[in-house]
Amino acid sequence: MKTLQDYIDKLNALNFKDMYENDFFLTWDKTDDELEAIWVLADALRFMREHNISTKIFESGLGISIFRDNSTRTRFSFASACNLLGLQVQDLDEKKSQIAHGETVRETANMISFMADVIGIRDDMYIGKGHTYQKEVVDSVTQGYKDGILEQKPTLVNLQCDIDHPTQCMAYAAHIIHEMGGLENLKGKKIAMTWAYSPSYGKPLSVPQGVIGLMTRLGMDVVLSHPEGYEVMPDVVDVAKKNAEKSGGSFRITHDMADAFKDADVVYPKSWAPFAAMEKRTNLYAAGDQAGIDALEQELLAQNAQHKDWCCTEELMKTTKDGKAMYLHCLPADINGVSCEDGEVEASVFDRYRDSLYKEASYKPYVIAAMIMLAKCQDPAQTLKALEERGILRKMK
């Protein structure tokens, strides 16, 4: 049976000092030790909550959330993570702010950050915009701190941008690590990141990009599968190739869903929009070309409709490793006969993995909390020990 000291010992064996007072943009910005520290600390925080030990490292402070796209799981995961550490969450509704009246990013970032310790941002809809916006926010609060406007520089956590979805993908990895009995057991395991049909269009590229950008770090055999014309960002493909070479894993692209599923230990069938089309959409929005946007939407819907056979079926699942591959999804999935007529996954497959999917999602609040804590505590291992010795109950019995 594990004790808190087991997690503390693991943390003490890792080098993650550069995460202190730093931000989290992309998983491939971080070292292997830094990624492992997040998983270890996430497990430690979960252990403490399950044992009714308060993990509040803040007596006051704000966690600011900015969501430029719809969210349920990530929104509540960020709020849960902040609450777990003692921060109060304040969501910035840009429609109700002065941004519509010409307030600059620098001004907004500083005005919301006087007592903020963390800012979580989701900005995933437009290629070339989300990651850039997050960087601009960080540059703004960094300068505000240097100029003495802010008492502290809030840490940024990327809650999804146009390039990566790190909190989601780190939660996937945490789930896989637990299911496979340890990080070292992921080496050589096959994961299929495959496109799947959806009756909608424009789903973000950051999920498949985040998966191939992270899982190739872990020595896994990563297969990216999609119909021709559904390519992801070339820069992220290059990252995946380099990661695989360094980790001893592998990375390849196929246009055959069955090839990807064959003998896979983990499958992740999900729809996404073609990179080239999303670049075009960004340019059309920038030009205010509504007719062009409408035409592109119809073009993409017609393109999707040609690939309705790209679906996670019982037949395909039988071809995976022992017919029992792990099935991942960020949710909500497009389920045949439930949320749509034709979609990403057959209802019987989804129903069989429902509990596993919910369990997978439960790792995200702890992953986000770990990211925040590593950025705000100079010695997280010592902080864990102090929290244990303090002995404050999370909930009175």
Place the predicted regions along the sequence by residue.
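Positively charged, low-complexity intrinsically disordered leader regions
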Residues: 1-76, 80
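Phosphate/diphosphate ligand-binding glycine-rich loop within oxidoreductases
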Residues: 56-177, 335
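Glycine-rich phosphate/diphosphate-binding loop of Rossmann-like nucleotide-binding domains
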Residues: 68-80, 177-291
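A short helix->loop->beta-strand "cap" motif at the edges of active sites that frequently abuts
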Residues: 147-154, 220, 319-328
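Short, conserved loop/helix-junction motifs that constitute active-site signature segments
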Residues: 185-187, 216, 315-324, 352
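Rossmann-like adenosine-cofactor binding region
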Residues: 242-346
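Adenosine-phosphate binding glycine-rich loop
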Residues: 320-397
